A protein has these predicted regions:
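Extracytoplasmic substrate-binding proteins
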Residues: 26-28, 35-39, 45, 102-103, ...
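A short, structured surface patch at a secondary-structure boundary
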Residues: 44-99, 103-109, 114, 207-210, ...
Length: 335
């Protein structure tokens, strides 16, 4: 073999067996907490500390690299086979250390003390907070940058933008925008106000948040609810699910006589939304947006079919997040 041919052969072998090492250039990223990290090599093992992060990781085709998730991570189904490393603020550091990940994708709700401790142990911890549509795009691209899947991330974001733009185009010129309440509980009446993820989805779907005057997530009185009189009421799947699989939060709007005068109740316009897609800033938010557009404007988008009850579909254990709100310790999540 000629020397030049031998040299080329050696290069080809190196390309095959050392491709990842040769093809990776260290990247510097600043996460949503403002912390700067340098990813020296392409991660081969990943721990996700939030359901939203987990969905993004799997959407990018990185499921086989996941070695740890939270007990609230439930999508895709393969996630249920992964080692759990605790909850949000109750992450189990020992289990994370045992998994020995190359990178950890965290959420602010994991607690700054936990995040700082993991960093002191030498782990690359990237904090992601996708609390808006644009924030979701950024989160997907951040994970893509950190894992060498930029092309896949860009493709997902492009598809999401195309689908959202299609909704916006169909709503051009529409002036009838129903008033919408997103209810998380009754007594107290917890609602999604302005500056919330749900408020943005309601607006994009051609509606008006009935409680836009409430900042963030907050409680409104019965009197305010009756006076505001939303045309459409949304509740999350899994919210206070009964043992028979019925959504007791949805049912309570129809059984509480004090609410019988509400327009949404009289017109039976109280809808169940898939909480895993409606409350998580991941790739599937477009599904909820398309469904919400059907609810608000069936004359344009067709009729809406409510999701299967959480009693028979996987993964509504994330509802403890809502329970945390009701208890006064709001853990918004999903993420």
């Amino acid at each position: 073999m000629k020397p030049v041919h031998l040299f080329i052969a050696v290069l080809l072998v190196c390309a095959v067996f050392c491709g990842t090492a040769l093809g990776w250039n260290p990247v510097t990223v600043t996460d949503d907490s403002g912390f700067e990290s340098i990813i020296e090599s392409q991660p081969e093992t990943i721990v996700s500390l939030a359901p939203t992060n987990t969905e993004i990781i799997f959407a990018l085709g990185l499921g086989d690299k996941v070695v740890g998730v939270t007990e609230y991570c439930n999508y895709p189904e393969e996630t249920l086979t992964k080692q759990t490393v605790g909850g949000y603020s109750t992450i189990n550091v020992e289990k994370i250390v045992a998994a020995n990940p190359d990178i950890i994708f965290a959420n602010p709700k994991n607690g700054q003390e936990n995040i700082d401790y993991l960093r002191r142990l030498g782990y690359s911890v990237i904090v992601i907070q996708s609390d808006s549509v644009n924030g979701t795009y950024d989160a997907i691209q951040m994970v893509g940058t950190c894992t060498g899947t930029t092309a896949e991330a860009n493709s997902i974001v492009s598809d999401m933008k195309t689908r959202i733009d299609a909704i916006s185009e169909k709503l051009e010129g529409v002036t009838d925008k129903p008033t919408v309440m997103h209810a998380m509980s009754i007594e107290p009446y917890w609602v999604s106000g302005s500056s919330t993820f749900q408020n943005e989805l309601i607006t994009l779907a051609g509606g008006t948040n009935a409680f836009a005057d409430v900042e963030g997530w907050g409680v409104v009185t019965l009197e305010k609810l009756l006076t505001t009189d939303p045309q459409i009421i949304l509740v999350d799947s899994g919210s206070k699910m009964g043992t028979t699989g019925e959504n007791t939060l949805q049912k309570s709007f129809f059984t509480d006589q004090r609410l019988s005068s509400l327009t949404a109740v009289r017109n039976t316009d109280v809808y169940v939304m898939n909480s895993d897609t409606f409350d998580r800033g991941g790739p599937r938010i477009v599904e909820s947006l398309e469904q919400l557009a059907q609810i608000l404007h069936p004359e344009i988008f067709g009729n809406y079919a409510e999701p299967i009850s959480s009693a028979s579909s996987p993964g509504f254990s994330v509802i403890p997040v809502i329970s945390g709100i009701i208890g006064g310790l709001f853990i918004y999540r999903r993420k």
